[in-house]
A protein has these predicted regions:
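A conserved acidic, glycine/proline-rich C-terminal tail/linker
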Residues: 249-253
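Conserved N-proximal alpha/beta basic substrate-recognition cap immediately N-terminal to
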Residues: 6-113
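C-terminal active-site "lid" helix and adjoining low-complexity regulatory extension at the edge
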Residues: 236-240, 254-258, 267-301
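Active-site nucleotide/adenylate-binding loops and adjacent lid/helix of ATP-dependent enzymes
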Residues: 4-7, 82-191
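Conserved protein-kinase catalytic-loop segment immediately C-terminal to the catalytic Asp
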Residues: 133, 208, 266-268
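Short glycine-enriched loops at secondary-structure junctions
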Residues: 60-62, 81, 213-214, 220, ...
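Phosphate-binding site of ATP-dependent enzymes
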Residues: 143, 147-248
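Protein kinase-like catalytic core scaffold
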Residues: 132, 215-216, 261, 274
């Protein structure tokens, strides 16, 4: 069996994950070939190459995923599931629709402090209470996420999100993380106001799920910030995952149709968990278990 592991061209070639994936695949009888994409279009290198048995896409190149799907090739993750999990409001809607606990989230809007369509601080706090979270629709690693407790912090966060919006549009690089068209980039630059779960301040549990099974989990924490992300200075350590936490993570991944996912669980006072975000392209450097092995042992091709 042959699979293609496809990364954005911006990925450092020194990334150890390449060998981790390839070694784990080989141990499970799979030959994995590594490719890189450098364009928002489906490049000729993929159209001319022999079709693999499956594609493992380490990025958000939706057109490439759709092209392989049109050829009858299994893509991990599917284009539909990646569209859902990349957009934090679509994620909220799907989880909420299925009754999976997740922070209350208001409809997205453009981050322009001077526009009439931007809700005021008072409007957001009336619906979500204060403090609340402000974040952009597309993004990861805790970037462009703000804790809002006063009108001034709201104004400053909107200005920073607006600057990020202009940067994404102005660069016209069409980075697949933020979209492959200007319309997608515009959508991804919109912001959402979200309920803040104060009981879980600075800590969450990242759960890696593959084909409906938990293959790893880790407690992430930060004593100096409300963000627990490792990329934002957080730390990590092993922890036990209660059955209800595993159930929440599996349900969230399945709700979005993800074969492989990283699910971030917030702690609730009643001992339950709330799904903060679901990542269809999760890293796993902080994992204490062999995530690639877990993937290829459980993957259904």
């Amino acid at each position: 069996m042959i699979g293609y592991l496809i990364y954005p061209a911006t990925t450092p070639r020194t990334n150890n994950a390449f060998s981790w994936f390839c070694d784990a695949a080989m141990q499970n009888g799979i030959e994995l070939k590594v490719f890189f994409y450098n364009s928002p279009q489906v490049e000729e290198q993929f159209k001319q190459a022999p079709l693999p048995d499956f594609v493992f896409l380490r990025g958000y190149h939706i057109p490439l995923a759709q092209w392989y799907e049109s050829q009858g090739i299994k893509v991990i993750n599917t284009s539909e599931s990646m569209i859902l999990c990349r957009d934090k409001f679509l994620t909220f809607q799907k989880l909420d629709e299925l009754g999976i606990p997740t922070p209350q989230t208001l409809a997205p809007f453009l981050p322009s402090p001077k526009e009439n369509h931007t809700p005021s601080f008072e409007e957001c706090s009336a619906k979500l209470s204060t403090p609340f979270i402000l974040k952009q629709l597309y993004g990861s690693k805790g970037e462009n996420v703000y804790l809002i407790d006063f009108p001034e912090s709201y104004r400053q966060a909107l200005e920073q999100c607006h600057a990020e919006h202009l940067r994404r549009i102005g660069e016209k690089s069409l980075n697949s993380e933020f979209g492959t068209t200007e319309e997608e980039i515009e959508r991804g630059s919109m912001v959402i106001a979200q309920q803040y779960i104060s009981f879980s301040r600075g800590r969450d549990t990242r759960v890696w799920v593959c084909e409906g099974k938990v293959i790893g989990h880790i407690l992430r924490y930060n004593e100096n910030s409300f963000k627990s992300n490792f990329a934002q200075g957080g730390s990590f350590k092993e922890t036990e995952l209660p059955e209800n936490g595993a159930d929440r993570a599996i349900a969230a991944a399945q709700a979005l149709g993800l074969s492989f996912a990283g699910v971030d669980l917030l702690y609730l006072e009643n001992g339950d968990f709330s799904v903060c975000e679901v990542n269809g392209n999760p890293g796993f450097r902080t994992a204490k278990t062999d995530i690639p092995q877990g993937i290829f042992r459980n993957l259904k091709i």
